């Protein structure tokens, strides 16, 4: 069982390992989402392309936002380099979007990565996820102009980066702020 990272608004935020049974709703939700947007083969490639062990301490972790003991949002991180955590498998339950859960998951990922000594976060998302692109931009992530384009300059995926705050600078309630959620393309991860 993972350590409890905090409790806000009736939600529990905790750090876990990929093998934790509480991660299953996140992985199932991601598989369904990726399959619907990119097809079965691409979904399988994305979800099996990184070994689960890469998301384990000391270099990685999984963050779950839970309501009543069930994951409603979350994500994972792993070591990209000594200074940079790569965020992957970022997810919000489709039935719970536009409630600030994506922001909570991202804040929890940033906090967990900073506590492990990372100074920067890197993440990528696909072209069929405009709501994710909008959320990352709103959260202060910078789109890379050097990564994610083909030789002709067409965008094939979106790569983002952000400097992480030191653990003492973290917001006490990552869901606070009164934002109604990021909306783009008729859906939202937030």
Place the predicted regions along the sequence by residue.
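A short beta-loop-alpha structural element at the N-terminal edge
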Residues: 11-26
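C-terminal "cap" of GNAT-fold acetyltransferases
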Residues: 18-19, 119-122, 126-190
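Alpha-helical interaction/dimerization surfaces of two-component signaling modules
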Residues: 30-33, 112, 135, 139
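Active-site rim helix/loop that mediates acceptor-substrate recognition in acyltransferases
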Residues: 36-64
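Conserved beta-strand in the GNAT
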Residues: 62-64, 70-79, 86, 91
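Conserved acetyl-CoA-binding loop-helix of GNAT-fold acetyltransferases
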Residues: 92, 98-111, 138
């Amino acid at each position: 069982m993972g350590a409890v990272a905090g409790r806000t608004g009736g939600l529990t935020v905790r750090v876990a390992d990929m093998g934790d049974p509480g991660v299953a709703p996140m992985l199932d939700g991601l598989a369904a989402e990726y399959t619907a947007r990119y097809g079965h083969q691409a979904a399988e490639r994305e979800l099996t392309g990184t070994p689960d062990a890469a998301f384990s301490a000391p270099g990685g972790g999984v963050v779950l936002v839970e309501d009543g003991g069930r994951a409603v949002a979350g994500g994972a991180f792993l070591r990209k380099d000594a200074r940079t955590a790569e965020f992957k498998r970022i997810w919000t339950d489709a039935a719970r979007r536009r409630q600030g859960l994506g922001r909570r998951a991202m804040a929890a990922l940033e906090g967990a990565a900073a506590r492990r000594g990372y100074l920067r976060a890197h993440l990528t998302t696909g072209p069929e996820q405009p709501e994710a692109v909008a959320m990352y931009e709103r959260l202060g992530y910078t789109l890379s102009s050097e990564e994610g384009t083909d030789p002709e300059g067409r965008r094939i995926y979106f790569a983002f980066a952000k400097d992480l705050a030191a653990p003492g600078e973290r917001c006490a309630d990552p869901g606070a702020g009164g934002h109604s959620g990021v909306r783009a393309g008729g859906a939202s991860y937030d």
